[in-house]
């Protein structure tokens, strides 16, 4: 049985015709890492549409796992205060929890983060400390009820 689960989003490589975001308004944790800030923790990003221009979003960035730059979208584990994950539709739409402990970043935020395409990584750890991971090269949510599309698996779970 797994006792620790983390889910991470990573960006697709920036295309030549895309504008590079200024360092002071990164779109995700990979842009924060690319700007030279390499400490894991809570950071502010500015995800694209459907957010209003300039709306900041607080996220937890993992700068260590698999070369870093991952935007953490969920974390569950053994923390002093356990987060209740039995939420309604609005709870999962908007997100909940404490970014430094257990949380869900929110379906609407994940949708906005993955408009240009994402990869997703799942890290698991059991009670004995045995770890596993699954990495999918293509991940997205649709705007209609957040329908999931995922493909391109590699990993050991």
Q: Model-predicted segments: where are they?
A:
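Extracellular beta-rich globular recognition domains, centered on the fibrinogen C-terminal
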Residues: 17-157
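Intrinsic-disorder-preferring feature that marks N-terminal prepro/targeting segments
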Residues: 1-12
């Amino acid at each position: 049985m797994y006792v620790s689960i983390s889910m991470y989003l990573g960006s697709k490589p920036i295309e030549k015709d895309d504008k590079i975001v200024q360092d002071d308004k990164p779109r995700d944790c990979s842009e924060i890492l690319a700007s030279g800030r390499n400490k894991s923790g809570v950071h502010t990003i500015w995800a694209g549409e459907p957010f209003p221009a300039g709306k900041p979003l607080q996220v937890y960035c993992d700068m260590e796992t698999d070369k870093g730059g991952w935007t953490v979208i969920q974390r569950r584990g053994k923390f002093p205060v356990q987060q209740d994950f039995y939420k309604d539709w609005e709870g999962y739409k908007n997100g909940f929890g404490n970014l430094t402990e257990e949380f869900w970043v929110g379906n609407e935020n994940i949708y906005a983060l993955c408009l240009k395409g994402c990869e997703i990584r799942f890290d698991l750890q059991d009670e004995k400390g045995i770890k596993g991971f699954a990495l999918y090269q293509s991940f997205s949510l649709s705007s209609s009820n957040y329908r999931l599309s995922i493909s391109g698996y590699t990993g050991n779970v």
